[in-house]
Amino acid sequence: MWPAPAKLNLFLHVIGRRADGYHLLQTVFRFIDRADTLRFEPRSDGEIVLATPIPGVPTDSDLTVRAARLLQQASACRQGATIHLDKQLPMGGGLGGGSSDAATVLLALNHLWQTGLTRPQLEKLGLTLGADVPVFVHGHNTFAEGIGEAFTDIELPPQSYLVLHPAIHVPTAAIFGAPELKRDTPPIRHGEWQPGQGHNDLEAVACAKFPAVAEYLNWLKQHAPQAMMTGSGACVFAGFASRREAEAILAQCPADMNAWIADGLGEHPLAKIS
């Protein structure tokens, strides 16, 4: 089994916009121990088969299939694979699940097919699939800039996170495309950032467009003022120095709130695979 861990954005600032429409960001990616898992069966016919398709997602559009085919093309590999995906991370939750799945496909099949691509080469491939994919391939908690492709490793203290997931899908494009999105937060230098500093510029737009996000975030902030949204939503979270603190807040969650605790990781579980 090959893990594809979730990420949290410990802050997310939009500091500008390029002429081509891409937004310039600053953020810290933190891997957590909540994950999808993948399993691969080698095939000699060169076919890429997704044994566990996601309802509503055409197979050819699925990031796992696209990642596998991209690796085949880049490496001239004639082998194939049947992909089994155990999907635990919500789609449209801001946890990077699809990007993480794609990164794990690149890392796993590069290893299993023995294609010999380096991690920087896999990061370049990943960027063509999505802006977050290279960070998952890279394998370390990072301070990321640009459109997410420029990053610096960062050491983070151990923390436990209480994550609340409103049962909705927040489309990233709807948040970044909103005219009211704040796009001029002053940039900070990565060496000056400290845990707990910063905010998520996408939060106000997501809360206005999706009342469930606002409801969950407001509830969590009443119990943990440091709470914020991750990515473009829908999940919100709060970090704690100990798991016991997170469990105390979890115990107060209304029964109809989807909530869980995850621990921060020092690095991606596949950080040392080659």
UniProtKB/Swiss-Prot annotation:
Pfam families in the record: GHMP_kinases_C (PF08544), GHMP_kinases_N (PF00288)
Coiled coil: none
Active site as annotated: K7, D132
EC assignment: 2.7.1.148
Source organism superkingdom: Bacteria
EC class (word): transferase
Keywords on record: ATP-binding, Isoprene biosynthesis, Kinase, Nucleotide-binding, Transferase
InterPro entries the record matches: GHMP_kinase_C_dom, GHMP_kinase_C_sf, GHMP_kinase_N_dom, IspE, Ribosomal_Su5_D2-typ_SF, Ribsml_uS5_D2-typ_fold_subgr
Positions that bind ATP: P90, M91, G92, G93, G94, L95, G96, G97, G98, S99, S100
Reactions catalysed, as given in the entry: 4-CDP-2-C-methyl-D-erythritol + ATP = 4-CDP-2-C-methyl-D-erythritol 2-phosphate + ADP + H(+)
A GO term, aspect molecular function: ATP binding
Record-level GO BP terms: isopentenyl diphosphate biosynthetic process, methylerythritol 4-phosphate pathway; terpenoid biosynthetic process
Annotated SUPFAM superfamilies: GHMP Kinase, C-terminal domain, Ribosomal protein S5 domain 2-like
Pathway, per record: Isoprenoid biosynthesis; isopentenyl diphosphate biosynthesis via DXP pathway; isopentenyl diphosphate from 1-deoxy-D-xylulose 5-phosphate: step 3/6
Homology family: Belongs to the GHMP kinase family. IspE subfamily.
PANTHER family to which the protein is assigned, alphabetical: 4-DIPHOSPHOCYTIDYL-2-C-METHYL-D-ERYTHRITOL KINASE, CHLOROPLASTIC
Role: Catalyzes the phosphorylation of the position 2 hydroxy group of 4-diphosphocytidyl-2C-methyl-D-erythritol.
Protein name: 4-diphosphocytidyl-2-C-methyl-D-erythritol kinase
Gene from which the chain derives: ispE
